[in-house]
């Protein structure tokens, strides 16, 4: 499962688990509940607030799945349309549940976009790179987050899609296989190849940076 890699990746991408105190969580939940009520009433101001608060984060999600800005924009737009049309199905389950619901819709729209373009392939090119030993891990030390994300964006589409679902969406290879209509071992292979390509990109990046100071 390469759990060490996932832990390293999430930590060095500077994602932090911050536990708010009880009062802060209550205030956040209350604010979200009021917003949801207004969204259900289709109040324009509420939808503008929702877009302002979450569009940046969701645009970032879109850009992890597709390389072209125009495609990311289309996915984001379709995601908000889907949210507007399906808000009645949303069930509030506490702080963070609204964001989770929106992210889930955005990821689904990204996958839909990729499938419609017909650009996703489950084929594995064995000569893409040398085999990477299972124990070798990606060393993200001292690499800016945006550089890491750019490396992910430049992965072949199949590798990138599987990598995103496994690492960021925390899907199992069995779940990914169902989502993408591929074999479970194909998902695992594509993740392994994605990891290998990232390791090579990171090595090249560090070598390039080191050469600048010599």
Q: How should these model regions be labeled?
A:
Residues 112, 120-145:
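Internal acidic/polar
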Residues 1-56, 153, 174-175, 207, ...:
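N-terminal module of bacterial RNA polymerase sigma factors
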Residues 60, 74-81, 96-108:
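Structural recognition of an alpha-helix C-terminal capping motif at a helix-to-coil junction
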Residues 111, 159, 168, 179-207:
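DNA-recognition helix of helix-turn-helix
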Residues 40-41, 80-95, 116-117:
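Sigma70-family region 2
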Residues 89, 103-124:
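Arg/Lys-rich amphipathic alpha helix in sigma70-family domain 2
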Residues 40-49, 59-78, 184, 206-209, ...:
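Short, charged helix-capping/linker segments at alpha-helix termini
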Residues 53-56, 64-65, 164-171:
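Short helix-capping/turn signature of helix-turn-helix
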